[in-house]
Curated annotation (Swiss-Prot):
Entry similarity comment: Belongs to the pancreatic ribonuclease family.
Gene3D superfamilies: Ribonuclease A-like domain (3.10.130.10)
Keyword presence, Glycoprotein: yes
Gene Ontology molecular function terms on file: nucleic acid binding
Keyword tags: Cell adhesion, Fertilization, Glycoprotein, Secreted, Signal
Leader sequence segment: 1-24
Name listed for the protein in its UniProt record: Inactive ribonuclease-like protein 10
Glycosylation site residues: N129, N204
One GO BP: defense response to Gram-positive bacterium
Domain of life where this protein originates: Eukaryota
Expressing tissues: Male-specific expression in proximal caput of the epididymis.
Amino acid sequence: MKVTLVHLLFMMLLLLLGLGVGLGLGLHMAAAILENQPLDEFWPSDSQDTAEATEEGQGTRTTEALVLDNKEMAVPVWSEDTVLSEDEVGGSRMLRAKTLLQSKQGYLKFDLNIRDCNVMMAHKIKEHNQSCINDYTFIHEDPSTVGAVCNSPLVDCDLKGGKCHKSPRPFDLTLCKLAKPGQVTPNCHYLTYITEKVIIITCNNTKQLEIK
């Protein structure tokens, strides 16, 4: 009788040890699986959609452009020292900043929130009940750097005139795309794509921009 009771206690002890080892192994395996799981599975679905849209937005397009400084961000409300001019480009407009803001108060330190297209496009809304601009590209480079592209050798392109100049390196860009067609000012809502791409421009009186 005593032998049977000892055996029973011994078997129960082994069973408890086995359960403990199994539970520890299971937790370790679960931790290993979580460690190897891609982080994007924990992101909101809209973040994944934005990433996919950025990849899809890599195609060539003719668009509007505004040159801004790459280290500091110009406030969307322009001072009197800033001269802006618009050129008609195939039915759309291209805005050029001939002189950037000189006052220190006219700049904001680089911030991703400032790169939001809804913030940067705010200064473009001058009248209500007008069609929103469909596409707009902000070039975050020194104006002299962009201007120097016109000194590079001519290259063939699909823009009007067929002769263009290509930037020697990718430029820091913010691509703004209207979220839904048919919107009218002041209710213009844009998707924001921050990227680096080579630009191709014409350097005649009517400048055009192409993104590669």
